[in-house]
């Protein structure tokens, strides 16, 4: 019943109101375009700020190697070559 009523109303409507005034569509398109540009700029600015904050916080801490110290002895010891007695 309801789909039949909706179909009947759609058939009786002569023309959509938005299609009658194309200038209004152009104005709304321009507003939407500017809105998209503003949102894109704000998003990029936010990403750059977050990245800079992450870099500075990483530089403040010692990073992955906190608590590790260098060994006092060398990894490879040198071999002493001695000639056999004759």
UniProtKB/Swiss-Prot annotation:
Q: Which residues carry this modification: Phosphoserine?
A: 69
Q: Which InterPro entries match?
A: CD3_zeta/IgE_Fc_rcpt_gamma (IPR021663), FCER1G (IPR042340), Phos_immunorcpt_sig_ITAM (IPR003110)
* Residue list for modification Phosphothreonine: 78
GO molecular-function terms, A-Z:
identical protein binding; IgE binding; IgE receptor activity; IgG binding; protein homodimerization activity
Membrane topology is: Single-pass type I membrane protein
The residues that cross the membrane are 24-44
Q: Which residues lie on this side of the membrane: Extracellular?
A: 19-23
**A single Pfam family, by name?**
ITAM
Q: Disulfide bond: present as a keyword of the record?
A: yes
Q: Which domain of life is it from?
A: Eukaryota
May I have one GO cellular component term? ficolin-1-rich granule membrane
Q: Which residues carry this modification: Phosphotyrosine?
A: 65, 76
Mostly located where? membrane
> Is Membrane set as a keyword in this record?
yes
Q: Which family does it belong to?
A: Belongs to the CD3Z/FCER1G family.
Give a short account of what the protein does. Adapter protein containing an immunoreceptor tyrosine-based activation motif (ITAM) that transduces activation signals from various immunoreceptors. As a component of the high-affinity immunoglobulin E (IgE) receptor, mediates allergic inflammatory signaling in mast cells. As a constitutive component of interleukin-3 receptor complex, selectively mediates interleukin 4/IL4 production by basophils, priming T-cells toward effector T-helper 2 subset. Associates with pattern recognition receptors CLEC4D and CLEC4E to form a functional signaling complex in myeloid cells.
Describe its assembly.
Answer: IgE Fc receptor is a tetramer of an alpha chain, a beta chain, and two disulfide-linked gamma chains. Associates with FCGR1A; forms a functional signaling complex. The signaling subunit of immunoglobulin gamma (IgG) Fc receptor complex. As a homodimer or a heterodimer of CD247 and FCER1G, associates with the ligand binding subunit FCGR3A to form a functional receptor complex. Associated with CLEC6A. Interacts with CLEC4E. Interacts (via ITAM domain) with SYK (via SH2 domains); activates SYK, enabling integrin-mediated activation of neutrophils and macrophages.
This protein's name: High affinity immunoglobulin epsilon receptor subunit gamma
Name of the coding gene: FCER1G
